[in-house]
Amino acid sequence: MARTFFVGGNFKLNGTKSSIKEIVERLNNAKLDPKVEVVLCPPAPYLDYTVSLVKKSQVSVGAQNAYLKASGAFTGENSVDQIKDVGAKWVILGHSERRQYFREDDQLIAEKTAFALSQGVGVILCIGETLDQKKAGTTLQVVERQLQAVIDKVKDWSNVVIAYEPVWAIGTGLAATPEDAQEIHHSIREFLAKKLGEKTAQETRILYGGSANGKNAVTFKDKPDVDGFLVGGASLKPEFVDIINSRS
C-alpha cells in the first residue's frame, strides 16, 4: 500500500521569531511535492506564531514534548490541550535527547504516548539505539523493547508515526546507509505485524531520523520501508525543501 511520505522538522532548542518566519516563508513560497506531509516542530514559545505563518495545507505544526496530565501543578510542562489550543496537531515523544538528558524511560514515554493519542494529537514516536548498543549487536532488541512498552498501552496506531533515530548518527554527521536503514525499518515493520497485525504494520509510517540532509535524502528514494524523515539541524536551513522534495 502507498503510505503518504512524511517529513518532520525538529528545530530542537533553536530559533527566534525572525529565523522561524524565514523558515516558514521559505516553505510557503517553495514548490513542494504535494504528496508529502510536512510537520514543523519549533520550541514551545513559538508554536502559536508558527501556526499563524503556515500557508500550505500540507504543512502542520507539532510540539517537541507534552506532559501526561491535562492540567495541574506541573511547573514548566505543557499539556496536550494547550498544544492543540494554539493549533498544533502533532507531538514528538521518546526522542533520544529526552531519554538521555531528561531521563525519560520506556514506561514514561509509553504513558505520554497513550495520553497524547487519547487527547487527539498525532504522535511522532522516536526509537533507536546508541553507539554502544549498535556495536554490541543489540539494535533490534533495543528498538523492539522501546516499541513493546508503547504496544502494551496503545492499541490504535492510526495516529502514530515511528521515527527510527540511530542515536550515534544524530548531530554527528554520520548516517546509516540507506541499506542499513531499510533493513532496520523492515524489521520494525515485521515486529509491528507480529504484535499488532499486518494491516497496522503496513499502514504505519516509519521515518529515518539520523542526520538526514539535502544531499543524502535522495539516496533513500527506492527504500520501500523508509516513509520519510525526522530532520534536525537541516530543517533550519534551505536544504529542508530538498529533503521534502527528495521523492519527486
From Swiss-Prot:
Catalytic machinery residues: 95, 165
State the family named in the UniProt similarity comment for this chain: Belongs to the triosephosphate isomerase family.
| Assigned EC number | 5.3.1.1
- Indicate whether Transport appears among the record's keywords: no
Name of encoding gene: TPI1
**Name of the protein described by the UniProt record:** Triosephosphate isomerase
Q: List the disulfide bonds.
A: none
Supply the source organism for this entry.
Answer: Zygosaccharomyces bailii
Q: Which residues hold substrate?
A: 10, 12
Q: Which PROSITE patterns match?
A: TIM_1, TIM_2
Q: Which Pfam families match?
A: TIM
Pathway(s) served: Carbohydrate biosynthesis; gluconeogenesis; Carbohydrate degradation; glycolysis; D-glyceraldehyde 3-phosphate from glycerone phosphate: step 1/1
